[in-house]
């Protein structure tokens, strides 16, 4: 009886018929759905039929059954296709899919017709996943080909560093067919032996190695701490207001969050208007029916609040601002567009019309302009040149975690610091967290080991940092400027939200002379070079919706980097990623329930993710309205260094693998600015200034830690 009441409560008085109630209850049992979830599916079904309300008739319920069946078959096919790798040397016969449906996400073909990249040796694309999609999970080309998937054994995924040609430099000539013997079915968890024995200091990949020599480093390193250098070679200056990051988390105001999201759309409306020389009258509300073409600016959102991760061009809507459309949403018709790359939260500008009141038909997409590049005066550049005495600048970048999953040994970090002091000798060392990872298996389980080297055992995770990390970090030469940037997974941070306040140097008992704690994200200046750093995995979290052969054939990391630059935010995705797991139940409190009830009682707990504080997302935008010279965004994906729109984009990779094997770090060499060598671009104006053109002067080496 209670089930009947739930059905009527959700579906309304039209469901108060015995045959309707019976049919809907049977569907809840058949698909293991609650009445509320079934009603949400019914709304999706109605929306797909372009109806705000669908009558509860026997005919419509039969069609609804087919809708649910198609969704179930789609997910089953995707799961099965992602868990198998074809090891046959014979190219399989590929049959055309005949049952493609325009329902939400079901129009994505499942035929893997794109060629796979050839790998000359095992390497890691992700530290946490064994399957990596080149492009988004819904990436397709204009002929409907599904995205390329590469699968590796768990050992490869954790321990590979990449001694062969990295994916960032793979060429089309290296492609292999799906039957290539390069790809083996995962059968073992044993890491590849050659990957375990990568020597420390081996260069895994390089950007621009032909034109620039590796910097000899900082000549002051090696001097006694009491000896002062004859001159200060580098200046590290923050380029943001640190006080703005000192907000209190978990106090989000819905009105403030709404204002921030609305301001993002309005600010880009002005940028589009100025860039394309449009008048305010050219912009109109895309949700209102009109036969005239208009310009519209808004945010890409899913067409259903219960969307899954498999989006496609047919399941997107445009969210307007209060001024542009009272915050309403309208579904998008992208059939007239040949090339596109969208993701959730992206601010876009369209030209089109809403002829029927249901869809906004996009006729053309207006590319967002890229931000300007930073400049310096000739006097400033000559000063930095004099400080370096004409030598190159050397910067080292590392990213945590810094110990393996089964222990707290920092032996690898100690070896690295010794190498930094005695051999590498950089001017600046940038270290990203997590330092003490709150998701570390031993910390998450509360099973901290005994530390025989300590007289007293650490009682808190803060004490654990002071006893493990602080003594090692203090051994860094005082002539090396060290920058610490936290992670939202850092146990030593009191600010576990993004944007994130900096660590407290005094609490970490680190010397003031050469240690600087920066926020996450942060922009800072090293001499004339502007660095933009963010410690949230944008490259992994950004899932694109792709259409068009030209777009899908481009390297995915280049596309994601361009999105970041165009959106002018280090994390342009909204909503942010969330990683959860099923919370284990206490055996003593388990109840005797049937299978259905036990499924409904699963409790999910939050592990990590972007953890966005929406009210303060303005702090994640590029400071000053210009792009950085060097943008560093660590990711769990394969390390890489690229030049995208004259910006050097770097992912240094993980410092250590989960199994304890060596990871990677980045070494940046930037030639000293020289007004005479032609690598700086003069910009005429009231006061002549020069573009830094760091991408012409920089070399990046990705090195085994």
From Swiss-Prot:
InterPro entries: DNA_pol_a/d/e_bsu, DNA_pol_alpha_bsu, DPOA2_OB. Transmembrane segments: none annotated. Residues 115-199 are annotated as: Disordered. Its main location: nucleus. Keywords: DNA replication, Nucleus, Phosphoprotein. It is found in: Nucleus. Residues 181-197 have a biased composition (Low complexity). The modification Phosphoserine is found at residue 126. Phosphorylated in a cell cycle-dependent manner. One of its GO terms (cellular component) is nuclear envelope. One of its GO terms (molecular function) is DNA binding. Present with 11200 molecules/cell in log phase SD medium. Non-catalytic component of DNA polymerase alpha, which in a complex with DNA primase (DNA polymerase alpha:primase) constitutes a replicative polymerase. POL12 may play an essential role at the early stage of chromosomal DNA replication by coupling DNA polymerase alpha to the cellular replication machinery. Interacts with MCM10. PANTHER family: DNA POLYMERASE 2 ALPHA 70 KDA SUBUNIT, DNA POLYMERASE ALPHA SUBUNIT B. DNA polymerase alpha:primase is a four subunit enzyme complex, which is assembled throughout the cell cycle, and consists of the two DNA polymerase subunits A POL1 and B POL12, and the DNA primase large PRI2 and small PRI1 subunits. Subunit B POL12 binds to subunit A POL1. This is DNA polymerase alpha subunit B. It comes from Saccharomyces cerevisiae (strain ATCC 204508 / S288c). The gene is POL12.
């Amino acid at each position: 009886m209670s089930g009947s009441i739930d059905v009527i409560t959700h579906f309304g008085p039209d469901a108060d018929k015995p045959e309707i109630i019976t049919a809907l209850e049977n569907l809840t049992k058949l698909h293991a759905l609650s009445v509320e979830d079934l009603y949400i599916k019914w709304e999706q079904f109605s929306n797909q039929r372009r109806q705000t309300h669908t009558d509860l008739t026997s005919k419509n319920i039969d069609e609804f059954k087919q809708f649910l069946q198609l969704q179930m078959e789609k997910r089953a096919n995707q799961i099965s296709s992602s868990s198998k790798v074809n090891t046959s040397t014979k190219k399989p016969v590929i049959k055309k899919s005949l049952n493609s449906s325009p329902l939400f996400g079901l129009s994505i073909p499942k035929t893997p017709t794109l060629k796979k990249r050839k790998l000359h040796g095992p390497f890691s694309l992700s530290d946490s996943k064994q399957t990596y999609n080149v492009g988004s999970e819904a990436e397709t080309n204009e002929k409907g080909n599904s995205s390329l998937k590469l699968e590796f054994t768990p050992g490869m995924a954790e321990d590979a560093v990449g001694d062969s040609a990295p994916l960032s430099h793979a060429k089309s000539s290296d492609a292999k067919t799906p039957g290539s013997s390069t790809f083996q079915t995962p059968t073992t968890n044993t890491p590849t032996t050659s990957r375990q024995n990568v020597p420390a200091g081996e260069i895994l990949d390089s950007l621009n190695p032909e034109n620039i020599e590796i910097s000899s480093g900082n000549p002051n390193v090696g001097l006694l701490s009491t000896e002062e250098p004859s001159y200060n070679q580098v200046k590290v200056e923050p380029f943001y207001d640190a006080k703005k990051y000192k907000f209190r988390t978990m106090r989000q105001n819905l009105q403030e969050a709404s204002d921030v999201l609305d301001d993002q759309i309005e600010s880009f409306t002005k940028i589009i208007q100025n860039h394309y020389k449009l008048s305010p009258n050219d912009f109109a509300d895309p949700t209102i029916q009109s036969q005239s073409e208009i310009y519209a600016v808004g945010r890409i959102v899913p067409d259903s609040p219960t969307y899954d991760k498999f989006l496609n061009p047919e399941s997107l809507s445009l969210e307007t601002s209060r001024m542009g459309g009272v915050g309403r949403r309208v579904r998008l018709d992208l059939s007239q567009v040949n090339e596109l790359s969208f993701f959730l939260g992206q601010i876009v500008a369209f030209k089109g019309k809403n002829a029927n009141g249901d869809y906004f038909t996009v006729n053309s997409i207006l590319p967002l302009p890229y931000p300007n590049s930073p400049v310096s005066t000739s006097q400033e550049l000559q000063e930095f040149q004099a400080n370096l005495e004409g030598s190159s600048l050397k910067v080292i970048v590392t990213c945590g975690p810094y110990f393996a999953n089964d222990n707290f040994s920092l032996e690898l970090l100690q070896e690295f610091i010794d190498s930094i002091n005695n051999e590498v000798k950089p001017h600046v060392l940038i270290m990203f967290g997590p330092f003490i990872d709150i998701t570390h298996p031993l910390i998450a389980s509360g099973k901290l080991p005994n530390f025989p080297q300590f007289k007293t055992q650490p009682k808190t995770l803060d004490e654990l940092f002071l006893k493990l990390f602080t003594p090692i970090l203090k051994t860094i030469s005082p002539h090396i400027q060290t920058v610490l940037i936290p992670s939202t997974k850092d146990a030593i941070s009191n600010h576990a939200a993004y944007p994130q306040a900096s660590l407290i140097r005094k609490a970490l008992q680190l010397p003031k002379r050469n240690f600087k704690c920066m926020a996450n994200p942060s922009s800072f200046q090293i001499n004339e070079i502007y660095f933009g750093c963010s410690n949230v995995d944008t490259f992994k979290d950004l899932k694109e919706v792709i259409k068009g052969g030209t777009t899908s054939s481009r390297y995915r990391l280049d596309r994601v980097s361009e999105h970041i630059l165009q959106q002018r935010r280090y994390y342009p995705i909204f909503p942010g990623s969330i990683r959860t797991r099923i919370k284990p139940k206490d055996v003593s409190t388990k109840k005797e329930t049937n299978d259905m009830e036990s499924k409904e009682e699963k409790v999910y707990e939050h592990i990590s993710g972007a953890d966005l504080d929406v009210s303060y997302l303005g702090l994640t935008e590029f400071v000053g309205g210009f792009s950085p010279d060097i943008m560093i965004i660590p990711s769990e994906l394969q390390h890489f260094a690229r030049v995208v729109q004259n910006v050097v984009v770097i992912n240094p990779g993980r410092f250590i693998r989960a199994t304890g094997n060596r990871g990677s770090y980045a070494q940046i060499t930037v030639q000293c600015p020289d007004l005479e060598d032609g690598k700086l671009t003069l910009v005429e104006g009231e006061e002549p200034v020069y573009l830094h053109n760091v991408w012409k002067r920089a070399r990046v080496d990705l090195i085994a830690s």
